[in-house]
Amino acid sequence: MLSVKGLHAFYGRAHILQGVSLEARAGEVVALLGRNGAGKSTALKSIMGLVPAARGEVTFEGRRIERLLPYRIARLGLGYVPEERRIFTDLTVMENLEVGRQSARGDAPVWTEERLFALFPNLAGMRDRPGGRMSGGEQQMLTIARTLMGNPRCVLLDEPSEGLAPIIVEQMAHSIRTLKGEGLSVLLCEQNLHFSQAVADRAYIVEKGQIRFGGTMAELASDSSLREQYLSV
């Protein structure tokens, strides 16, 4: 589905990603874990073409995409939910969803407004509410829903649980598991290990722009020294 090999990326002269390699298979949830500043968000942005890849390969469904513009990558079926959310605060929930609408490709699930309201029931009663009058958790749900309106086959989620109330985090975890059940692949970057353990099949740990671990969540759970070295705050 999604394969990254030897990815290098820079911010100016700062060498942020230093040979990152990872993959997300069809229908799989993969967590990219690490401390703040480790390179997690940059990895997602580089996959989406928002931060140019200096070296390395990014392959999506058999096609090399590391030289494509972000809008071309999105049209191929790769969705991206940024940490900043970036909803249109003056537009209603329905209008925000309409902005993200694209036709489905191949056998990707077709997401309608009603299916999205079933996935995020909190949004169902807010159809005419402006995005600027929503809580942080509601805005996060709306951002994911808007991305799903593009009918992607793989979704990149940047810190989906950050700053959310515990009950909203639980709802977010349920929604991600539902996406997996629909056959979507999900690559999420997180600092919240507990949340990642609730949703992910496999994990990678990134530290100083390099992958330090790749394996199942069970393997990570059994290695306390690894968690202490790379994930403790």
Language-model-detected regions and their locations in the chain:
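Conserved ABC transporter NBD signature motif
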Residues: 56-65, 76, 109-113, 215
